Curated annotation (Swiss-Prot):
It comes from Archaeoglobus fulgidus (strain ATCC 49558 / DSM 4304 / JCM 9628 / NBRC 100126 / VC-16). This is Small ribosomal subunit protein eS19. NCBIfam families: PRK09333.1. HAMAP family: Ribosomal_eS19 (MF_01474). May be involved in maturation of the 30S ribosomal subunit. Keywords: Ribonucleoprotein, Ribosomal protein. Part of the 30S ribosomal subunit.
């Protein structure tokens, strides 16, 4: 059985986002916000919430136990400040927090004393998606079978 580590991250995130579209709805305010103070505009993709949700889910799987502040740092970026030199700024805490709440309501993530961790149900969900994705990739590229 393949795990999250065995498949490309971009393909896995897209596939998990498609699955999560049936399970959750983005908050009302999601269409009006930027993803952080370092951004000048809001996301152009209509389904950006599901992609961020899937990305956070994968991050918790890989890095867990992880907290909101560490995830904010991961999704941060360089803030342009005009003629002054750029500085790093963290990403939006509300987006990370609400995404984690949605994953907790689905039963995929739980809160512990050290931070958020993936539950066995969440690990099973991600591993099943990774296994399906890997079998499709092996049929396209037979050389991947040895991994």
């Amino acid at each position: 059985m393949a795990t999250v580590y065995d498949v490309p991250a971009d393909l896995l995130i897209k596939r998990v986002a498609e699955r999560l579209k049936d399970m959750v709805a983005p908050p009302e305010w999601a269409k009006y916000v930027k993803t952080g103070v370092h951004k000048e505009r809001s996301p152009e993709q209509d389904d950006w919430w599901y992609l961020r949700l899937a990305s956070i889910f994968r991050r918790v799987y890989i890095d867990g136990p992880v907290g909101i502040e560490r995830l904010r740092t991961f999704y941060g970026g360089r803030k342009r400040r005009g003629s002054k030199p750029p500085k790093f700024r963290k990403g939006s805490g509300a987006i990370v927090r609400n995404a984690l709440h949605q994953l907790e309501q689905l039963g995929f993530v739980k809160k512990t004393r050290e931070g958020r961790v993936v539950t066995p149900m969440g690990r099973s969900f991600l591993d099943k998606v990774a296994t399906e994705l890997k079998s499709e990739l092996v049929s396209e590229i037979p050389a991947l079978e040895k991994y």
